[in-house]
Design a protein with these regions (language model features):
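Extended substrate-binding grooves/exosites of carbohydrate-active enzymes
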Residues: 1-89, 93-101, 106-115
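Conserved, mostly hydrophobic/aromatic
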Residues: 13, 69, 90, 151, ...
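Extracellular/periplasmic ectodomains of large secreted or surface enzymes and adhesion receptors
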Residues: 43-47, 57-60, 64-67, 73-77, ...
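Hydrophobic core residues within well-ordered beta-strands of beta-rich domains
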Residues: 84-86, 103, 147, 314, ...
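Short, hydrophobic/aromatic beta-strand segments
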Residues: 97-105, 118-119, 326-333
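Intrinsically disordered, low-complexity Pro/Gly/Ser/Thr-rich segments with frequent PxxP/GP/PP motifs
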Residues: 103, 108-158
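Extracellular and select intracellular beta-sandwich modules with Ser/Thr-enriched
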Residues: 117-119, 166-171
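Beta-strand/loop-rich accessory regions of lumenal/periplasmic or secreted enzymes
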Residues: 138-145, 159, 174-480
Length: 480
């Protein structure tokens, strides 16, 4: 679209596939339709699920891609905002309709996801097709916090199938202020610690750290937690992992071969020279680490540090270098296996649709809540799905406890009842078996989605190919 708009001779943006092309074959035990695709009829020549790539399912249930398309093709678009002068410039993208006769415009200012001001913009003058107009928009901008201006376009009068006020699309503009950091992350990062020593014990394979309410156990072979217990409540079903793998998407079909040749799907963390430092009010565990897989040299090398404070905060500092010669990474992050009952998700970042570095046109910055099941995108062929980009905060909870991840540097997260290994193993969504845990991935980096099933390779700026990779994250455990 950037190319199309830059040159009047260009056209494009046409929908490649409206619906998933798949054949219904009854229903699953839980009542969902079972769909067949290429190869399911024992035919020798077929395209697999190549045509299961629509904007809607075979029974016309919208996929997230349809929401993306809707907002990409919105009727109006912000082309400039002068925050100092309070002037918002909007272009009419319609070919035949005056914008002022078609829609109304409202705005919201969001600070760290929360709405702090809202109002309507005056669209009184005619705006002919493809013309621009400048509107006055002078909200009060908070001096601190990550702030965004959300401009929403709504239908001004009823039309067939649509009612007045129907959302036609939106634009989001980042706002500048004196301190654009997420303030809750700032508060947690600077939370004062006491001066009481923490209890530390060590064996050949474990390091145990105890505060008044929190017990942490780390595996010295990985440098990662194997148990986190707060007031008697265990938060980990399985040991934590450093994670560079994802269930390949349809568009990963070519790069997947390189990923598997590099054994990314088998890569795990290994720690060397683990040290413990005890100070009043906190304990630091540091280790030289690598991400390694069988038969190949380490994919990543670097340093990992955990800091545990007497205020029950665990802080992770991860600094890694990617070994030259390896392909770009699918992702880099921390994978936690929480109890399945922890299925409520509250997050501050891009939502409510799934979002990736190159797929986020249907999302905006806000504070959202959902269940783990709500976040799953039920593609017929299971694959990576449901990530949310540019987040500073996510809380996973049940009625008894919560785990909150906070960071000043934005991260992506994914919460699912399915492991990435299960998504890879199954041919169709109705064959998936829940893991019995809530699988929480906290990612410092996540590769884009792209269009390499039949289009060009993923653009370099959307690849995880930096030599230096890092992650800073705070985990706060709470019981009720």
């Amino acid at each position: 679209w950037e190319i199309i708009r830059a040159d009047k001779r260009m056209c494009g943006g046409f929908v490649w596939e409206w619906c998933d092309h798949a054949v219904t074959a009854g229903t699953s035990e839980d009542g969902r339709p079972i769909y067949l695709y290429g190869g399911d009829h024992d035919e020798q020549i077929h395209d697999g699920n190549f045509c299961v790539d629509g904007l809607v399912s075979p029974d016309r249930i919208p996929h997230s891609g349809l929401a993306e398309l809707k907002n990409v093709q919105r009727p109006a678009r912000v082309v400039a905002y002068d925050q100092d002068k309070g002037l918002l410039t909007i272009v009419n993208e319609l070919d035949h309709t005056d914008l002022s006769q078609h829609l109304s415009i409202s705005y919201e200012v969001r600070r760290d996801g929360a709405i702090v001001e809202h109002g309507d913009l005056d669209l009184n003058e005619p705006v002919p097709p493809h013309a621009t107009t400048t509107l006055r928009c002078e909200p009060r901008i908070p001096e601190s916090g990550r702030c965004h201006l959300l401009v929403t376009y709504r239908l001004a009068r009823p039309e067939p199938l649509l009612t007045t006020g129907h959302i036609l699309g939106f634009d989001e503009v980042p706002l500048h202020n004196s301190d654009a950091r997420h303030q809750r992350a700032v508060e947690l990062a600077h939370r004062p610690v006491g001066n009481q020593p923490l209890s530390v014990s060590r064996t050949a394979t474990r390091i145990d750290v105890d505060t008044r309410d929190l017990h942490c156990s780390f595996d010295v072979r990985t440098g990662l937690p194997v148990s986190l217990v707060h007031r008697g409540s265990e938060f980990l079903d399985r040991p934590a992992e450093l994670n560079i793998w994802r269930a390949p998407t349809d568009n990963d079909r070519h790069i997947r071969l390189e990923w598997e040749r590099a054994h990314y799907h088998q890569a795990t963390a290994r720690a060397y020279a683990v040290d413990v430092s005890e100070e009043p009010g906190h304990v630091t565990i540091s280790a030289e680490v690598a991400v390694v897989a069988p038969t190949v040299q380490p994919v990543l090398r670097g340093h990992l540090t955990w800091t545990i404070t007497d205020s029950d905060v665990l802080s992770l500092n991860l600094r890694l270098q990617r070994t030259l010669g390896f392909p770009s990474l699918p992702r880099l992050g921390l994978r936690l296996f929480l109890p399945e009952s922890m299925n409520q998700v509250d997050y501050c970042g891009m939502g409510p649709q799934e979002s990736y570095v190159d797929k986020h046109r249907a999302s905006y910055h806000g504070f959202f809540n959902a269940t783990v099941a709500d976040l799953h995108q039920d593609y017929i062929r299971p694959q990576e799905n449901g990530s949310h980009a540019d987040c500073n905060e996510v809380t996973i909870s049940d009625s008894d406890r919560s785990l909150t991840a906070l960071a000043l540097c934005p991260f992506s997260f994914n919460a699912s009842h399915y492991t990435q290994e299960e998504l890879v193993a199954q041919k169709r969504n109705t064959d998936l078996t829940p893991s019995g845990s809530t699988v929480l991935c906290l990612d410092a980096a996540m590769a884009g989605i792209g269009s390499n099933s039949c289009g060009p390779t993923l653009r370099p700026k959307y690849q995880v190919k930096n030599h230096e990779l890092e992650m800073d994250l705070h985990l706060l455990l709470t019981t009720f």
